[in-house]
A protein has these predicted regions:
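ATP-dependent adenylation/nucleotidyltransferase module used to activate substrates
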Residues: 2-194
Length: 194
């Protein structure tokens, strides 16, 4: 799908969006089976809407919530108010992740760029990413002095937080159960999601 197709679909009326969503849900369940799928549920608006649509068709489909320990108590209570929700937890705590890997700052993309540029710099490698963060290359969203200072920050910078606290527990759940997720991701939210 290209950006023009995406823009066209974003302008569909709500009824058509819901209909297309239900068609995709049906196809997913037809392929994997009702017992072979689950809804990845964060308690946020996107996954709550997805859970509602999925369960309007298949009331018994499981939801899985990764409790990172960083959620507001109200979100955890909201998640627990739904039936058939499995709560999983990461192996590492947030404190351990930031101590071992570094802090997530600015965005996942910037944190990732800083993490690997710093690693390459420490290894004596001159990479494009490093030059971009140092402001020596043009044509990059990271080619800004405001991000370059993070290379010299007195703390580690990393995008590992989301991977360790959310993605790894979900991958482990998939490996243990063989189930595949429905994931609610809005294209309008950030460059990574487009």
């Amino acid at each position: 799908m290209d950006m023009n197709e995406l823009k066209l679909m974003q302008n569909y009326p709500l009824e058509l969006k819901v209909m297309k969503t239900k068609m995709r849900i049906q196809e997913w369940v037809d392929y994997y089976g009702e017992d072979g799928v689950y809804v990845s549920f964060s308690g946020g608006k996107d996954s709550t809407v997805l859970l509602h649509i999925v369960r309007s068709m298949y009331p018994n489909i499981e939801a899985v919530f990764s409790n990172t320990g960083l959620e507001f108590p109200e979100i955890v209570e909201f998640v627990k108010s739904f039936d058939n929700v499995t709560i999983i937890k990461p192996e590492k705590s947030f404190k351990r992740v930031i101590t071992e890997e570094g802090y997530p700052v600015v965005s996942k993309a910037v944190s990732n760029a800083v993490r690997y540029a710093k690693k390459n710099e420490e290894e004596g490698k001159d990479t494009l990413r490093l030059r971009q963060l140092r402001g020596l290359e043009k044509g990059s969203k990271f080619n800004k002095a405001k991000w370059g200072f993070l290379l010299d920050a007195p703390f580690k910078v990393s995008d590992a937080c989301c991977e360790e606290l959310k993605k790894k527990p979900m991958k482990k759940y998939h490996k243990e159960t063989g189930k595949v997720p429905f994931i609610a991701t809005m294209a309008a939210e950030g460059g990574v999601r487009k």
